[in-house]
Amino acid sequence: MTSMTDQAARKPRAEDVASPDAIIKAVYEALSGPAGKRNWQRLRSLYLPGARLIPIGNRVQAEGRTDVMSVDEWIDDISAYFEEHPFYIREIQRHADRFGDMIQVFSTYEASSDPEGEKKTRGIRAMQLLHRDDRWWIVNVMWDNETRKNPIPGEF
């Protein structure tokens, strides 16, 4: 259950949650930037209370570890890295399937420490979205980076 204080802290920008395209764009914008603090309140506002983030495979902070984390746990885990390192991530391809108010999205991304530089990492985010209360929410996100043993399939 979410308290009124939690709900107020999660108040989104209307344009960030108006459509599936908008919420996915907002996630990538909230994560990208030069070394320093991110707008964590903006990021939190995109997620349904109780949402889970599941980084798998090679991770910046803990290679090979798989954790199921709340949004706040993930922010606690990664914020020191973002404060010390520039990180730019953008979507390069998307596959989405919708049924009613739910959407399963496979979002292929590339990430780099330089917004104009060579790509450093590519991967896929599996995102589940839900339309409730006149807005879109992110319910869960699981992602993995591409490796030689785990290349991104052609359809993605």
Where are these regions (language model features)?
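Short beta-strand segments enriched in hydrophobic/aromatic residues
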Residues: L31, Y47, Y109-A111, M142-D144
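Non-catalytic cap/lid and distal C-terminal segments of serine-dependent acyl enzymes
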Residues: A14, W74, T121-I124, P151-P153
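Short, hydrophobic secondary-structure boundary micro-motifs
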Residues: N39-W40, I54-I56, V139
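Surface-exposed, charged secondary-structure patches
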Residues: R52-L53, G57-P115
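Hydrophobic residues on conserved beta-strands that form the core of alpha/beta folds
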Residues: L48, E91-Q93, I138
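Short, low-complexity N-terminal intrinsically disordered segments enriched in polar/charged residues
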Residues: M1-P49, F156
